[in-house]
A protein has these predicted regions:
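Solvent-exposed soluble domains appended to multi-pass membrane proteins
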Residues: 1-359
Length: 359
């Protein structure tokens, strides 16, 4: 999962002097890719993170006890389960929650990344994407090759704040039509995005010739906040008014892509290319399983049934149904949503209740 990664070129009217998305778009051209509608803007990273790992919709529980997740599902299929995030384990209570979601090992600043050399640049004391992706590659190479490998990691580069008083990287948007603050902040954000794209491409390249089948999933957690009240989006000519369909899509849309090396394409019988649906983060794991040709657990079957009609379930009970934003579901769609939430409660509580009963 890529911190604050979004494709501003997908928003109508935004033009660049240099393309900050050249490497990312090259990856999209050889991947299965689509759009997520995130629950948040500029923060709340764990909403997308935990939705992907569980399939659960907003609002989330606090995960204070062992809870069912796709991490546990992979572990039950014989996978090792690990990951990393160059942030502190106490933030969002990630250490405890990740243990409760079933990760056997997770690297944080305290137990791993504080000792990692970061080379020429860092981000608030954290490793940059070059160091982070190299570390995740090293973790993969150190795996037990006799065991299948599931790794979920979260980047830090791209995290706000972005300076609005000085340029800290390259120039991608011209100054014409932008205030000084917008010019600096937007270009600083795009400089980070461009570097993330370069690091993604290098990371993907490192798996191309791997004899083991490898499938990689990348997605943004949310769009960045650009200026007070997102005022700098307006200077770009982008509508982010939440009272309109266009504004909601612009404000909450982030990209996802699913890439597979040749070995995985042969084994799974899929090219892993083409255009995917616009969905909520909670449906992304099901999208991955569909590409892999895997059935998944019963919970995922219900997710698929719901996704066909309601592909986006947004916080505060906003939905996308038949391509349109709705604040109130139609009578024929409401039972699908209600059934999903009831099943979600059961799936979430089942493991906790089982453990309570055995104690």
């Amino acid at each position: 999962m890529l911190e604050s990664f979004s494709d501003l070129s997908a928003l109508g009217g935004v033009t660049f002097e240099r393309d900050p998305y050249a490497d990312f778009h090259a990856l999209q051209a050889e991947s299965y890719c689509g759009t997520l509608i995130s629950d948040t803007n500029g923060g709340g990273t764990i909403n997308a993170e935990r939705s992907f790992l569980t399939g659960f919709a907003y609002p989330h529980s606090r995960y204070r006890r062992d809870t069912w997740s796709y991490v546990r599902y992979f572990a039950a299929q014989g996978y090792s389960t690990q990951g990393g995030h160059p942030g502190y384990e106490w933030f969002y209570d990630r250490r405890s929650v990740n243990e409760n979601l079933g990760f056997s090992r997770y690297d944080f600043m305290e137990n791993h990344y504080e000792a990692l050399p970061v080379g020429g640049s860092d981000y608030h004391g954290r490793p940059d994407d070059a160091a982070f992706f190299a570390d995740r590659r090293a973790d993969y190479l150190a795996r037990d090759p006799s065991q299948s490998y599931f790794s979920f990691s979260v980047t830090y580069q791209g995290h706000s704040p972005y300076s609005d008083t000085a340029l800290e990287g390259g120039v991608y948007c011209a100054h014409d039509g932008l205030s000084d603050g917008a010019y600096c902040m937007i270009n600083n954000y795009l400089s980070s995005v461009a570097d993330t794209g370069r690091q993604l491409r290098a990371y993907v390249d490192s798996f191309r010739e791997d004899e083991a089948p490898v499938v990689l999933v990348f997605f943004g957690d949310h769009k960045p906040t650009l200026g007070t009240g997102n005022c700098y989006y307006a200077e770009l000519g982008v509508n982010v008014n939440e009272n309109s369909d266009e504004g909601c899509r612009n404000l909450y849309s982030v990209p996802y892509l699913i890439w597979a090396n040749d070995a995985a394409r042969r084994v799974l019988g899929d090219r892993f290319t083409g255009q995917g649906e616009t969905i909520s983060p909670g449906f992304l794991m099901a999208e991955l399983f569909d590409r892999c040709g895997w059935d998944g657990p019963a919970w995922m079957q219900l997710q698929r049934d719901t996704r066909r009609r309601i592909p986006v379930i947004h916080r505060q009970e906003l939905f996308v149904v038949d391509g349109k934003w709705e604040s109130e579901l139609q009578p024929d769609a409401r039972p699908l949503y209600d059934e999903l939430r009831i099943a979600e409660y059961y799936v979430r509580e089942k493991l906790q209740r089982r453990e309570q009963g055995s104690s």
